[in-house]
Structures are given as structure tokens and as C-alpha cells.
Amino acid sequence: MPIVKLNNEYLTRLTGTDIETIRSSLPMMGSEVEREEEKQTDVQFFPNRPDLYSAEGTARALRGYLGIETGLPTYEVKPSGISFSVDPKLANIRPYLGSAVIRNVHMDNAMIESLMGLQESLHWAVGRGRKKVAIGVHDLDKIEGPFSYIAADRKTTFVPLDYDVEMTMEEILAEHPKGKAYARIVEEFERFPLITDAKGRVCSFPPIINGELTRVTEDTQNILLDVTGIEPRAVSVAVKILCAAFVEMGAEIESVEIDGVVSPDLRPEKRTVSVSECSKLTGIPMTASQMTELLMKMRFGAEVIDEDTVSVDIPCYRADIMHDHDVYEDAAIAYGYDKIETSLPPSFTVGKPHPVQKLYSLVRNIMVGLSYIENTPFTLTSGDVSYSLMHRPENPAALHVLHPISEDQTIIRTDILPLLMESLSINRSRELPQKIFACGDVVENLVTYPKMAAASIHTSADFSEIYAVMDAFCRMMSIEYEVRDSADDAFIPGRRGDIYVSGEKIGVFGEINPDVLVGFGLEHQAVAFEIDLRGFVSNE
């Protein structure tokens, strides 16, 4: 979770109260104050609330929670007359673009620092290290529309931010600090994303670096915002959060036409919720009018429909509200968790570790002893990662998400190994060797069961290495196994094997297929094994 550094003077100015009140209120809103200094407060927010990753967003929420300013923030968006065109050649590179014009910005150093912090936090929380989303902020008065988002030749030159000489895009990836850090996102493509103005001047090379031409300073008054990415919802979320933050700075928002589509859309989402369900779920007795007051403290628009129904307007920046229960959680936060009365359970019981957790602890101890580092991948993944990239047939027993919010999270994982391969891909710029493992639940046909997997990548990884690691793991788990020929196309024929116990297949191991390595963007040989742990859960 990101640590948000809040300037005390700026935060109190935005909130309208003193820093002591702010610091005492933040934990009750679901955050954790990490450090308190004379001029700065460091706060850790949960990843589901990226709208709080700035002094502006935090102040907006605090004003509601403290009753200083409640209800739905409203955002007037005027047309700017500025347009963007998107090159169809970007379809398989970085196809999505969001934008807005920010007028009448009067920025001091605290505002610039807050904006830069929000930008980087969104790159982490929403953008997955700029792969899914990257943000560009430009001084609009230095450039002219209409603007073009194009797939440019790799030899295109411009002066990158913090430099005073022109460089080709290839040179930027090889030499510029930001280029070296994020080259992995675009280096595989024949052409690179580029944003230019009406005169062909370069504004940005997303997701790598802006041009020095459009640097934002304290003298900047009008801003062009660009957000590019590979997932349209994530792009839209980032644009909305940034626009809402600029409004807190006193700026005005104007829309941009992107191939005829207007951006941003800052209208609230409407939803109706049940008062009785909220009371039952939270344990807080309340009426419809009381629930309305609580939700308005959390900056929702709320109106009583009848004694059990409340109409809710969800602010555009609240990307975390995906279910009625998310609204009920906010009502409980506004009520105050410290005010909820505790009660003893009606019966006395003694807790003990769950057998599956005991098994996982044993697996962790063994793998750490074998010099592997634990990885904790997400439970939700995609069919592309689990099957297509692994050269495996789609599993008909996979449980699909009905309304996925991201193309990366469409199924509940049925295997652990594909997620380890994805982790190796994300960390391919790190030093070798990398030896990682993970253990956790997978789901097939609505049945949840435990699995583990391990993977190793380095210049000399081979079948003998992973066979030895798998054998050591099985011996320490007291697993008596036999190896048979495998037909798993995720591994190289002749350098793979299935693991059998009592005539039943429980796993697979071997050298990863070169085609799989290419799919994940890996340049070195990798080896891996995966084992179904269902048969080793103790009944004690």
C-alpha cells in the first residue's frame, strides 16, 4: 500500500480544521498514520481508495466525515474545443486514451508536490507500474491542439523531461532513468506510443516520459491531462480522480473530444440501497433518514425513497463502489466503528489453526529452506495468463467472474504456476537468479482446494535442478511418488514429467516451453513444478 505524504499546512488549509483533528480522524476513516512530523504527515491508505492518495482527496473526504461539508461534490465540465485523434496502429500497443483540460490553475510548491505524489501513487495502484495506466500532465500554453496520439517510429527524436538534448525514443529507453525503469512495457513493439500537438511537437512518450517542452511549473495556469493505457476502465478512473483533485485546487475542468467521444465524464453513478439490509449487515440500527445523513458524510448524494430504500449518487472518483455492501461499509465508517457496541458470543469455543493453514505453513518452511522466496499472487486472473500463454487448453471447470471490472481478472485461478510466470515476467528486469514459490487455494467446479507451485529462472536452469528441488520437497513432505511421461505443453517434451501418488496424478514439473517464455517476455530458461495438495491435508 502506498504511503501518501501530506503537507500539514496545505492539508489544514484544504480541510478547514487543525492538524490534530485531522490526525485523530484519519484512522477512523480506514487509514493508518505512519509518521507525524512538524511539516508533514505520512498516511497509508488501502489500495481500494486511490481517490485518497493526495492532500486534495484526503481533505475532501475529511470535510465530509467531520461534517464541515457534506453531500455530493458537483463538477461542471465545459467543452474546451480541443480534440485528440488516436492512431488505429496503437490497437495492439496501447490503445486507450483519456484526457481533460484544466483551466485557471494557480499552483504553489505544495500543490505541485501533491500532484506528483498522486500521479505516482495512481501509477502504482491503478496503473500496475504504468503498464495498465500512465499519466501525463502538460503546460497547455506551450502547445497547440488538435493533438494526435500516434504509433511513432522508434527513431523519432525529442527532448525528454529533465534533459536538454534531443534523443531518439530507443535512446530514451536505453539511457534515460525513466526509460530504463519502464522499457519493458513497450520495448517489444515495432512502433512506440507518442503524443504530438498540431505542429508535430512531442508532448509525451507514454508510458515512459513527458517532453521537456511541456514541463509544469508554478507559473503554469492551464494544463492538458493525458492518461493512456491498456484497460479502458482503469484509464477512466485515473482521469476522474485527477480531475476531482484539480477541482479541489480551485481549477476548472473542460472536456476534450477523442475521436468524437467526450472525456471526462464526471457524472455520478446512481444506485438504490436497502436500509434494513445495511442495518443487518453492519449491526447498526438506523432509519432511512439516518442512513442518508451517514452517506452524505461520506460525500455521497443520498435521498430517502421510502422507509427501506435510499437513492444514492456515487461520486465519479469512487471506483471502489461495486456493490451495495460497499455503500453499507461507508455508512458504518461514517457512524464510527468505535461507537459500535461489542457483545460476547453466546457460546465459548477454543480456536486452533485450520488444517489447510498448517499445511501451508509446512510448505512455506520447506520452500524457504530450499532458498525460494514466497510470492503472493492474486486469486483472480485471466484465461490468457492461465491457459493461452501457458499453451494449455482452457479448463471447463474454471469459475468465471460474471461482471469483471478488468480484463486481467476474469476467472478465479485454477492453477498457481501461471501466476508465478506472470510474476517472473513483471520482474524480468531484476537480477538473476529468481526462485519463487506460492501456495494457496484454487477453485474448480465450485470446489476450493490447496495447491503449490515453484519456479526458478536463470541462465543455467535445467531439468536436473527442478527435479532435485521437487524431490527434496516431496521427501520433506513424506510424499512417496513416481514420475511418468507428461503431455503438458507448458513444458519442453522430453524434459517434463507428471508426478503420481498411488496411481493418481498430483503434479507436473520440468523445463518451461520456450514458446511460453516468449509469451511472458522472458529471455532466460525457467524451470518449475506444481503440486495438488488435497491429499496431504491432516484431519487432526
From Swiss-Prot:
A GO biological-process term: phenylalanyl-tRNA aminoacylation
Names of required cofactors: Mg(2+)
Residues the entry annotates as binding Mg(2+): 320, 326, 329-330
Keyword Cytoplasm: yes
Location relative to the cell: Cytoplasm
Pfam family, one: B3_4
EC number: 6.1.1.20
Catalytic activity: tRNA(Phe) + L-phenylalanine + ATP = L-phenylalanyl-tRNA(Phe) + AMP + diphosphate + H(+)
Organism, scientific name: Methanocorpusculum labreanum (strain ATCC 43576 / DSM 4855 / Z)
InterPro entries: aa-tRNA-synth_II/BPL/LPL, B3/B4_tRNA-bd, DNA-bd_dom_put_sf, Phe-tRNA-ligase_IIc_bsu, Phe-tRNA-synth_IIc_bsu_arc_euk, Phe-tRNA_synthase-like_B3/B4, Phe_tRNA_ligase_beta2_arc, PheRS_beta_core
Transmembrane segments: none
Keyword Flavoprotein applies: no
Keywords of the record: Aminoacyl-tRNA synthetase, ATP-binding, Cytoplasm, Ligase, Magnesium, Metal-binding, Nucleotide-binding, Protein biosynthesis
Molecular function per GO: ATP binding; magnesium ion binding; phenylalanine-tRNA ligase activity; RNA binding
GO CC term, one of those recorded: phenylalanine-tRNA ligase complex
The family this protein is said to belong to: Belongs to the phenylalanyl-tRNA synthetase beta subunit family. Type 2 subfamily.
Complex formation: Tetramer of two alpha and two beta subunits.
Top-rank taxon: Archaea
Residues in B5 domain copies: 266-342
The protein's name: Phenylalanine--tRNA ligase beta subunit
